[in-house]
């Protein structure tokens, strides 16, 4: 008889300040996808979420402290550095904190995250790159036992859909070429200006993320001739993998997972942003009525289900050490 899975006998609390709102419904969907995957794999996981913004941190810490006094959780997993500080100050232990990118590279939040890294039971980053400096921005400290725990794409949602069908559902012109910038244009590190410059140079319409409902995002990806990741930096770069999961070409700066995921893939580009080079890569895709790449096989090893398995293994390790 197989031994019972220890995670069926523990309760995990996930803490996140990635709570979505009407203007950014996609925010934090990657955390929610991972939670759902962990539940499907047998773990009992509850979620404590609150909106981003400095006015929310003190009230959230008080509410979290009260929750931890009223209910027992065997492990707390916070996503994003400031949410991690809330959990730490609320007395959460054992505590895992996953750092996602901006919380490491930001000039104000980054130093706070590096201090927090020495005060938790497991430091997790969504990519190895976050442990190294990048363009003068420090990374996370090399805390012994640190882990890499990304949140991967939900392959149940992000899959290849006929481009004509995606455009029909979105009421987009079936004949026109489109580029998709899937991020929120208001986030400066995502560099919407680069995507807009490229679309203008190629004479095509740029579709923009930010206010797209999460369940509709796979339609927008499949409707586009190519997905643009023009960021200055990414923790993991989930948009690149979501495009690949749909077999849609991705053009990306060398950030996050892109150098690994796009290496040697025909129809894709991973290079520093240069208008001439990117235009040359984009034009053949814009001239093709249905450009596709062999991307799904590259996204599969990093799927939400696979990354949930990896995260549950990290929980087992932490609970084994603490116990």
Regions of interest found by a model, annotated:
Residues 118-146, 153-160, 311:
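A short, active-site helix/loop in glycosyltransferases that binds the activated sugar's phosphate group
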Residues 232:
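Aromatic "clamp/platform" in nucleotide-sugar-dependent glycosyltransferases that forms part
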């Amino acid at each position: 008889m197989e031994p019972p899975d220890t995670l069926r006998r523990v309760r995990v609390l996930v803490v996140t300040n990635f709570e979505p709102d009407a203007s950014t419904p996609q925010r934090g969907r990657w955390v929610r996808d991972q939670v759902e995957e962990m539940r499907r794999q047998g773990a009992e996981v509850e979620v404590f979420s609150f909106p981003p913004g400095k006015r929310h941190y003190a009230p959230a810490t008080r509410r979290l402290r009260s929750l931890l006094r009223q209910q027992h959780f065997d492990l707390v997993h916070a996503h994003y550095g400031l949410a991690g500080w809330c959990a730490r100050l609320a007395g959460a232990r054992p505590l895992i904190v996953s750092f996602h990118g901006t919380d490491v590279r930001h000039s104000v939040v980054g130093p706070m995250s590096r201090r927090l890294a020495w005060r938790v039971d497991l430091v997790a980053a969504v990519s190895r790159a976050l442990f190294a400096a990048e363009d003068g921005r420090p990374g996370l400290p090399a805390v012994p036992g640190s882990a890499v725990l990304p949140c991967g794409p939900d392959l149940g949602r992000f899959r290849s859909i006929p481009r004509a069908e995606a455009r029909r559902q979105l009421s987009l012109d079936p004949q026109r070429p489109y580029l998709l910038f899937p991020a929120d244009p208001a986030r400066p590190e995502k560099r919407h200006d680069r995507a807009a410059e490229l679309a203008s140079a190629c004479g095509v319409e740029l579709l923009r993320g930010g206010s797209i409902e999460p369940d509709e995002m796979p339609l927008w990806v499949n409707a586009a001739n190519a997905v643009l990741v023009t960021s200055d930096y990414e923790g993991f770069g989930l948009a690149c993998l979501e495009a690949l999961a749909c077999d849609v070409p991705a053009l990306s700066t060398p950030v996050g997972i892109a150098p690994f995921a796009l290496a040697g893939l025909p129809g894709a580009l991973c290079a520093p942003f240069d208008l001439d080079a990117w235009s040359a890569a984009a034009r053949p895709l814009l001239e093709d009525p249905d450009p596709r790449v062999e991307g799904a096989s590259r996204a599969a090893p990093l799927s939400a289900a696979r990354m949930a398995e990896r995260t549950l293994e990290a929980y087992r390790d932490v609970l084994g050490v603490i116990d």
